[in-house]
Amino acid sequence: MMTASFKGIRISKPIVKEISSFGSLTNIDLHTDPYEKVEAKALSRSRLKNQSVKKTDLRITNDYSSLFVSIENKKNTIPDIHCNNLSKRPVGFTDSYVPGEALLCPDDPNLVNELFDDVLKRLREEKSDSGEQFHWDANVTLSQENKWSFITGYLSRNDKFLKISSNDSELNVKASVISYIEKLSCTPLKLKYVESLAVALRTESVTWVRYFLLMGGHIVLAKILQAIHEKKHLKSPDITLEIAILKSMRCIIGQKIGTDFYLSNKYPIDSVVHCLLSTKLLVRKLAAELLTFLCYSEKPNGINAIMKCMKNFANLKVESMNVFDLWLSQWKRTLLEKVVTEEKKVLEEAALHDKITIEYIISQMLLINAFLENIPSKTALLQFKESLRIGNFKSILLILKKINDEGVLKQLEKCVKLVSLDTANEKHFLKHTPNSAAHQSLLNTNMFNDANFEFMVKEHIKNFLKLLKEHNNPVRIIKLLDCLVLTLQADKGNGNSNNDIDCFYKELKIGNEQGNNAPGYSSVTSGYGTTNSKKVVASYDNTDDNEYSVSKSELYATGDTNNTTNQGYENSERKYVESSKYETDLKNIFDCLCLLFPSEFDPQSSFSAEKIFSKLKHLLTRTRDSYISEDTKILRLLNRSSSKLQDRDQEYLISKNNVNGNGNRDWVQPVNTTSSVSAFASPRIKPKLLFQPNQDEKLKLCKLDLAKANSITLKSEPSSAVSTHSFEVHLSMPGTQIKSANLAEKMETSKHKVFNPKRIDVVSDLPLDYRKSYYGRFSITDTKRFSKIENMRIKEVIDGNPFKAPPPAPLPPPAPPLPTAMSSLQKFEKNDSQIFRKTIIIPENISIDDIFKFCSGSESEVYASKIPGELCNPSKRLKQLHWKRLEVPFEKTLWNIVVADPYLLTLKLTAEGIFKQLEDCYPLREVTVSNKKVKEYTGFMPVDLQQMVSIRLHRFNSLTPIEIAKKFFHCDHDIMELVDFFNDRKFFRQEGLKKQLKPYMSSRNEEVMEVSEKLLELSRFDQIYTLIVVDIDTYYEKRMAALKIKSFLANNFRDFRRQIRKLHCASLELKSSLHFKYFLNLVLHIGNFMNDAPRRAKGYRLESLLRASMIKNDKTGLTLLHTIEKIVRTHFPQLEAFLVDLKAIPEISRFNLEQLEQDCNDICERMKNVEKDFSNEGIFSNHKALHPDDHICEVMVPWIPSGKSMVDELNSDITELKTTLKTTLLMYGENPDEPTSSARFFNNLNEIILEYKKASTVNQKMEKEEELAFLRLQALKASVKSNNAENSGSSKNEEVSATMENLISQLQKGLCDDSLSNKTDCTESSKQTIETLMNYENDKQTLEGSNKKRQTVVLKAECMLKQLENNNELKR
């Protein structure tokens, strides 16, 4: 039997598209692979057809824990699933709910029960770890289908492959991502896979990257990087692979979703931090860039995650070594070590020529400055500054200052400014801190000393104000700050910190002890005019004294809502919301305390209300006792800091009050300037929706989430847990399932709570879609429209009776019945038409005589009106038969007389099933018009131009558009490499784009160019185009033309001169070559000998030699050129030296003199235009018309004289070359005035030389073959002689054939020595054999030596046998 191991379950696809869905899954068994076989899928589909599913079986819930909330009736909220009782799928249920196959519940009940218990156990562990409560009533019995549905739902939430929506349009994207992950998982890993992944992450869509992250691709990269770091000795392929992985990570972190994944997962950052210790310079550079980006991207999440990872540095090599000293020790490795240890002259030379070293230094300095700017903890910041001062970094700074680089000097100045000591407190503190351990202990003990308290409070207030400025919902920060400031002041007379903390703790504990009240927070009002502090503690129970309190009668919806909702369900949901809000608020306070007091509160430890407030009470009591003597000085400081905070709070709330022009969106009560009212009592402010430009449509709207930060979280509204507003928010969540059927039917008439400026609760009837759009589930247009309707309703209430809710809107009247004349035009569904047809009685026997015995004098319309509409109209639309209209009056045609009864004919056709047959055979296909997807806003720039710009400027992805424009105007080296791209007419000749971007161009204010505020509304590519093209459209083309001629001459001047010189030298060698002249004279004599008298000439052009390769020898098949080559090599070998004289001809034949001359003329013309533009009368002479940051004049004006001299040199070389070529062509009989004469001359000469060399190769090869043939003939003759000598002996050979044995036996008897005539015959036959073989060799037919010898021996034996036979006949 299959074991119930939870890890053994593998599910391929979810049943519904939502992530948190309950339902069955589709596989034959549990142990299936994502890549299932076709047979298994086909079987699953066949089983799915037999199994029907209800719409209510697909349960959608917001959180799994909500299924186990214990309610008053002690019943669990998991719905029962009765699959066996389902007969058919209801109407309207489509396959879009079930994208894959469906896996039925296993037949083994023990397996289901064991798995269900395992899931419950895991849920208890998860909820206990997160501090949440978990309830399950074991007395309730669930069906096996219900348990299996819950198991599969839990798996679909925790499986990384099932979290992805199974949309059919995204299957290709998923397959591509899975293929990449499989390639990364295989061993050994190939470098090309990681490099192609980096390209895909940079070029593919955001959806592709999101799927890659959801499937754990970033985890695979981190594990590969971790495996590389675990090796003791790294090889070159490992380092190259490490660089490719870091580049892929850089592409992931460049997007917001990638940054969130890396901050939520710890070990990917650990691997990146470990790369700072690499021996490869480029690896450390990439790692520093990634960490710098994380420091600035998510504050303070990024820096906190990096600081946690930096703690592992000390355990890598030396445990006693300081964390930051270990990192700073990497600065003297590889190339940087050479730069630091050499002398000044060598240092400057290395800094100028080694670009990677400069970039590495800048990256490390950027990371150091990022730490100095973003470390939130004062302890860690002081420790880091101390490490910079006492470590090796100070000596490195002194040497780095000698490097003449603008970027390095800028970062050094910033670093020195951040590290410099501003207060005497830090000097005293660092002076007496010999090491990091003592530093930590001293910091913990002296955190609340008299000298440091003022500095500490200033720093904390500065951090809080920074958070207040960056985020749009700082009410929780303000509340906690008010409470801390109030309790930290030690009131000698009337103040009591213990009472403040006790009240605060009591208010937080109210919601947990009482079921119908939420955790209330007191609003604390502090008066700083005197030394006494006044506290105003008002809970939600005290509704008469608190202006912002909510009455208990308003906690629940009234009217129709109480009639439509179930009381038990409402109580359970309210309790769940109260507990979740209490836990969220408690977690927020704990995070803030960890940020304020890191020595007392550990972020990684578990927390509870009793533990938090016991520590806080102890801390504040100790603080109060140490400051009783200095209460006057502290209170003065607190008065000053709190007043600033109070002003800031009021300014923020007033600015939020005017979100819209009419001020009706959010109303905020102004804060009293004489007291610091807690922001928890202020009205709710809806979270701001942030538009992400690089996100796809699914990720376009997202709320600001700081849940992972060590500060106050802002992921939800600070609304009351027991208000109807929170109740409606919970009901309108995307994952919340309405479990009451009565509630689902009456939801359209439920009430929604609206807040007016006077805090009057108004109950009004609003449609459900408006209420959903109010919470951000739908489009912004729906939200604005609902806001407008809401404001109108509020205005009506204020103008009328503000204390009385208007009555609910009446139900709309029923629709009026259709007229009788239109009843036949009404469209019926298929089922409805079948019902109507059953009510019509059709006679069984209708004769043809009854149909055609008809009154011919009646008109057809009268009888056609008798036919019911149910019979003459088909149940669905059929293919149309288009009639041709009559061209004569209808009365004159046969159609005017009715020859058959239409009614009986219709009944007959219906009874025979003819109409039914027509409906089945000729249905009309319904054409559904698909809704065109609205294209996302990608900017004004065309898509093809965006792709071109993104490819060309990919190296500047880390820079902002303003920084790119700065490089452009400063003529940076990287920009000069892209001059050809900026000169492309497809780039800057976009008149329509310029016209659209003209309103966003910058404006000039004296000597400063002010960027337009509207520029931020554009996309990144439009911003770049506006800054570098539209702003200088008047002189952009001439500016880039000047830079192009400068770049062209710098890169191609030497190549031009080298080509010209080679042409010149080759021409001179051709003129002075005597061997070539003698060779041409020899060919002339040979040709005149072959030609007839009229065809003989005194000279010829070189093109005539090509004719020699076309005249062939009839015997050998060779050409005349082969004969000429053999004559020269045999009889005139000294003439072959002309090949050495003309060795440069093959190379210069590829040069085009005409093209070189045209390019030089073009360069001269462009140089004249540049010189004219930069003259006193040119366009660049007016500096006011230029961009203030443009350095084109500083770059081009000093270069123009050198550029002009280079152009003059090219002109002189071209002139001299033309003169030499002209004389050379005249010498060899060519016309130099023709445009292409020189190119044709050198091409023909090159072809002659190549053909001559081929002929020489062929001739030499044939001569070697003839020599070998002659040697073979000599060897054959010698073998014949040796065979004759061997045959005259008496030796025996057992391996000889039977013929040879007979011959040898006859020879031993002496039968061959009596007759001379027989010897003569043998000799003659031998001669004939030898002549035959010689003729065979003369015909140049190759024969093997063994075959020749075998044939010779056989012939010899035959002759001798013939002699023996003759001798025997003579004896007889």
UniProtKB/Swiss-Prot annotation:
Which Pfam family is one of this chain's hits? FH2
Organism equals: Schizosaccharomyces pombe (strain 972 / ATCC 24843) (Fission yeast)
Induction per the UniProt record: By nitrogen starvation and by a pheromone signal in both P and M cell types. Essentially unexpressed in vegetative cells.
Domain FH2 residues, every copy: 868-1278
Q: Output one GO BP term.
A: cytogamy
Q: What is this protein called?
A: Cell fusion protein fus1
What does the UniProt keyword field contain? Answer: Cytoplasm, SH3-binding, Stress response
The record's comment on protein family reads: Belongs to the formin homology family. BNI1 subfamily.
What InterPro entries does the entry give? Actin_filament_regulator (IPR051661), ARM-like (IPR011989), ARM-type_fold (IPR016024), FH2_Formin (IPR015425), FH2_Formin_sf (IPR042201), GBD/FH3_dom (IPR014768), GTPase-bd (IPR010473)
The GO molecular function terms of this record are: actin filament binding; SH3 domain binding; small GTPase binding
| One annotated Gene Ontology cellular component of this protein | mating projection actin fusion focus
Q: Where is this motif: SH3-binding?
A: 802-817
Question: Where can this protein be found?
Answer: Cytoplasm
- Every copy of the GBD/FH3 domain together lies at 104-522
Q: How does it assemble?
A: Interacts with actin at the FH2 domain.
Major place of residence: cytoplasm
Function in brief:
Required for cell fusion. It associates with the pre-zygotic projection tips in conjugating cells.
SMART domains, sorted: Drf_GBD, FH2
